[in-house]
Amino acid sequence: QRRAKADRVLVSLGGWIGQQIATVPEKQRVVVTGHRTYDFMAKRYGFRELPVLDDYTTGGTLRPSSLSAISKSIKTSGSKAIFPESLPPSKTMRRISRSSGVPIAKQVPFGDGQAPGKSLIQTATSNVCIFVNAQGGRCDQETASQLQKRWAAI
């Protein structure tokens, strides 16, 4: 019975995520990161991931030509924010932000598993809301809270 309850919450979470992503204007359904982190989610929910350091650098070195290509790619992506791995952002991510004119997101999604001190559902809903709100969508916090409570009750 516990497993069935967990499955129901996870199915509800999947539907909720799709609804939140749908509030983001289609051109802005892109997550600009340093490294490939959200590939699975991007494919499942129909947004693009632009891992700029993975796509444009070799060995982590940011050359002037790479910075120019990254800036152009970000500008044309439609993204309203760059999502660094952590805050404060690295010097490289700050340079990319300045060069592209696209700001660093004020909040950072947790890209590696479950956030410390948070449940799986709290991590997922927080990450989705950070992305959706930064990209011009509207996140349904009330339903996110209900999902978190349902998960905690299992």
Please identify what each model-predicted range represents.
Residues 1-154:
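Extracytoplasmic metal-acquisition and chelation regions
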